[in-house]
């Protein structure tokens, strides 16, 4: 069953049908349709916000507000007439795409005295999937059980909970973005900063980006020219150049390849199975829980090992610019591994201060 409703409202000053609030004119568009549980909702917009709320109804409701401001009423009306939204509506798929006359492009938006924005307010079933594109604006989404494919440039993401394990997020030049929870997926970010409160398994590909995870089960990353923070992480695996990496508590494993940066792991728990680090021009600082049992092999060129732990070296070689250490710490029936290969960097292993 499909229900379709469309209203297009022009508000004009005086009796003509348009209300001008100062030098502002608006156009409103309303659509709603009943959809299937697994429907895909696709929105393509720019120069405005997407405000999306999921609910328990099997219906999608879309309200679009187009606002144009300026000093010349004729130019304002001309601009308003040049902006519209095209729709494709079915129970399986809902598509809304903002259409802006090509003559009113990016240059016009930034340098014309007439300014405009296109804002969407959307309600959709929580089980739907979304494909969202929004540039020069904010995307807000409270909660979604279906897959989220989200792209945002020169804007901001404010996301609540994403329960699918295959979400795809891509954003460039965004700032102060936040996600409360994401079960899994991939994140591609350039020239941005974002925070995630809690996550399952994430694959991160980032350049010139500051990323922060408060709690995450597994993080696989490639991150260059930025900062990566994981306050509490299960498994951390990745590569970085010119990367500052800070980890609070490590619970399972660590595998890193880093050049021209720094690695700081505050606390390696006894549950950690292995730590493998290959680094160049990178200082490494590891906090070791006193109950962690591990065999270690540390191979350094143009660097040295500093430690206040009671390391039991079975082999120790110091020849010219090379330093090599092999041994055991806190022997037990369950032995983990610590392997560090480093060139031009200092390695510090110190006990965690409780």
Locate the predicted segments by residue.
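Intrinsically disordered, low-complexity terminal regions
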Residues: 2-354
């Amino acid at each position: 069953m499909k229900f379709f409703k469309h209203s297009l409202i022009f508000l004009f000053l005086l009796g003509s049908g348009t209300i001008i609030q100062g030098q502002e004119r608006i156009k409103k568009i309303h659509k709603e349709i009943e959809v299937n549980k697994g429907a895909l909702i696709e929105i393509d917009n720019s120069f405005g916000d997407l405000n999306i709320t999921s609910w328990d109804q099997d219906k999608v409701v879309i309200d679009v507000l187009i606002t144009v401001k300026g000093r010349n009423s004729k130019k304002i009306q001309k601009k308003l007439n040049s902006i519209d939204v095209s729709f494709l509506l079915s129970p399986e798929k809902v598509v809304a795409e903002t259409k802006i006359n090509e003559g009113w492009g990016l240059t016009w938006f930034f340098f014309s005295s007439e300014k405009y924005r296109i804002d969407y307010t959307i309600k959709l079933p929580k089980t739907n999937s979304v494909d969202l594109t929004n540039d020069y604006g904010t995307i807000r989404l409270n909660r979604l059980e279906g897959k989220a494919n989200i792209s945002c440039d020169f804007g901001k993401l404010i996301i609540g909970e994403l329960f699918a394990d295959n979400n795809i997020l891509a954003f460039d030049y965004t700032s102060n973005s936040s996600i409360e929870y994401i079960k899994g997926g991939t994140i591609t970010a350039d020239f941005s900063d974002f925070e995630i409160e809690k996550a399952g398994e994430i694959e991160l590909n980032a350049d010139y980006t500051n990323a922060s995870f408060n709690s995450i089960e597994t993080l696989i990353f490639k991150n260059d020219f930025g900062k990566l923070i994981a306050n509490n992480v299960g498994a951390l695996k990745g590569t970085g150049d010119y990367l500052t990496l800070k980890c609070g508590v490590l619970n399972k494993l660590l595998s890193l390849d880093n050049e021209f940066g720094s690695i700081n792991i505050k606390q390696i728990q006894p549950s950690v199975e292995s730590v493998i680090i290959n680094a160049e021009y990178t200082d490494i600082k590891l906090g070791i829980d006193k109950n962690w049992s591990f065999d270690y092999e540390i191979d350094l060129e143009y660097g040295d090992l500093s430690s206040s732990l009671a390391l039991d070296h079975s082999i120790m070689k110091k020849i010219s610019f090379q330093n090599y250490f092999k041994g055991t710490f806190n022997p037990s029936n369950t032995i983990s591994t610590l392997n560090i290969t480093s060139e031009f960097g200092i390695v510090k292993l110190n006990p965690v201060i409780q």
